[in-house]
Amino acid sequence: MNWLLPLVLLLSLSGCGGGYVAATSGARAEFYSGQFDEAAKKLEKSAHTEGKDQLLYLLDRATALHQASLFEESNKDFLLADKIAEISDYTSISKEVSSLVVTEEIGHYKGDEYEYVLISQYLALNFLMLGKTEDALVESRRVNQKL
């Protein structure tokens, strides 16, 4: 019976490392080693799959794409992340937003206010890198609105 307590502890802790952190470990390793495009590839499926952590995956992938100088692709993910972040009632998404197809499970992570600001800041930077100064100004104004 001396083995029972450690077994119970091990089983209870095994669930702690799962989910988002475990799923992104490979992508994080690629990102930190400067392989931004590879990190983005590893995050693509999760970023575009409906689920409770989709916003997190989108933010990670969009940031990796930005670092890889893939500004158009980065903007697509940041714009989708922005739409998801703006949804206030996660229990009736299909009724509120017909253009964005997501499941009701997505409500688990809504994002923090600073992340909403970062989305607009990255969009502004991407637009500047693409030579779209008017769009960058729009996103800069959105930063002020979000603050």
Briefly describe each language-model feature range.
Residues 13-38, 45-49:
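Bacterial Sec signal peptide processing site at the extreme N-terminus
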Residues 29, 64-65, 126:
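Residue-level signature for tetratricopeptide repeat
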Residues 36-37, 71, 133:
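TPR-repeat structural position
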Residues 43-44, 78, 85, 140, ...:
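Inward-facing hydrophobic residues that define packing positions of alpha-helical scaffold repeats
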